[in-house]
Amino acid sequence: MAKGIREKIRLVSSAGTGHFYTTDKNKRNMPGKFEIKKFDPVVRQHVMYKEAKIK
């Protein structure tokens, strides 16, 4: 079988709260680091989440 295009990533909050989301991304369409603004329930605000590897 062929290797899948999608890889699992972890989105870590830039607020420094330790909160994270897990998702996957298409390596071919988005080769760079993924950044998105999402809600952080610890600080109760929308903040930037940056891609990190799942350990």
UniProtKB/Swiss-Prot annotation:
An annotated GO cellular component: cytosolic large ribosomal subunit
Recorded GO MF terms: structural constituent of ribosome
Residue intervals passing through the bilayer: none
Keywords: Ribonucleoprotein, Ribosomal protein
GO biological process, one term: translation
SUPFAM superfamilies tied to this protein: Zn-binding ribosomal proteins (SSF57829)
Keyword Nucleotide-binding: no
Pfam families (UniProt xref): Ribosomal_L33
Keyword Ribosomal protein among record annotations: yes
Source organism superkingdom: Bacteria
Assigned protein family: Belongs to the bacterial ribosomal protein bL33 family.
Record-linked NCBIfam families: PRK00595.1 (NF001860), rpmG_bact (TIGR01023)
Protein name: Large ribosomal subunit protein bL33
Organism in which the protein naturally occurs: Photobacterium profundum (strain SS9)
